[in-house]
Amino acid sequence: LSGKMQVFTGERGDYHRTRLTHTQEVASLARTLSRALRLNEDLVEALALLHDIGHPPFGHAGEDALDECLQPDGQFSHNQYALTIVEDLEERYPGFPGLNLSYEVLESQITRVDKTARSHYPLLEAQVVDAADSTTYDAHDTDDAIKLELLTLDELSEMSLIREALAAVNSEFTNLDATQLRASVVHYLLNRQVSDILATSAEDLLRYDFQSSDEARHGELVVRPSKELQEQKEELEGFLYERVYRHPELLKMRQRAQDRLQAMFLKYQTHPEWFPKKYLSLIHISEPTRRKR
């Protein structure tokens, strides 16, 4: 994950987050949430470390490029590919492929593959990871956008959550330079979300009083922000989508990245012998199956 970008490609510089740094941040935050809610910290950490492992290079731009390459015979989903990695591609044991992960880890990842088809909510530990993921990227995409000069704090102050953060920081500190102010705002964004999620989730857990993990699966979504914070997050995410993720410069980088990845796909499709030897045996299967994979 260390060489894989999240939103920004490396063309803007090295001082922004990658999939690895994002994953580490999600895992740390998820453990904090799970500890406060008295959930299974080890399971939460495993799910957090797994949640983005299936992403190709260039983030969602790469995922879209591979998905287009596989049409009309199949599709590419980073959540599905994560399962392929841990069940088929990894070779850690002599008797079988994969990592021999627990049922709870695999079940939780499966619920990420097609969220629209869920017949029940995922385990509370998986809900914690989803909440930590959302909390982390809202704060850190904001941070990266400012550092890369795609947005200013003045522009971001149009958003309710950023205005709240600036007001809180300015009431506590004076004479901060730009770097200190940005870092303090990001720190507030993280603390504000974590505190809200813990308060809302703890209240829901007391109300539902689940007696088993099965009851939690078939209950309501429990680990979540309050309605007020969710509205603020959606406002900020919409702003980031329009002003950052759809920024003309990023769209150009996205297209260049997709062109490179699709060219590589076509070359490997024409020359499968270029694959590392350990993967060649997976290619020598029936043509329809290979095309779908």
Language-model segment annotations:
Residues 1-21, 116:
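Active-site flanking loop/helix segments enriched in acidic
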Residues 283-293:
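Single conserved hydrophobic/aromatic residue that forms the stacking wall/gate
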Residues 12-43:
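Alpha-helical phosphate/pyrophosphate-handling elements in metalloenzyme active cores
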Residues 50:
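Acidic (Asp/Glu-rich) catalytic motifs at the cytosolic membrane interface
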Residues 46-47:
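Active-site alpha-helix of zinc metalloproteases
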Residues 1-3, 24, 28-31, 35-36, ...:
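Sequence-structural signature of the catalytic-core scaffold of metal-dependent phosphohydrolases
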Residues 15-19, 55, 75, 121, ...:
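Alpha-helix N-cap/helix-initiation motif
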Residues 176-281:
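C-terminal subdomains that position terminal phosphate/3'-OH groups for nucleotidyl transfer/ligation
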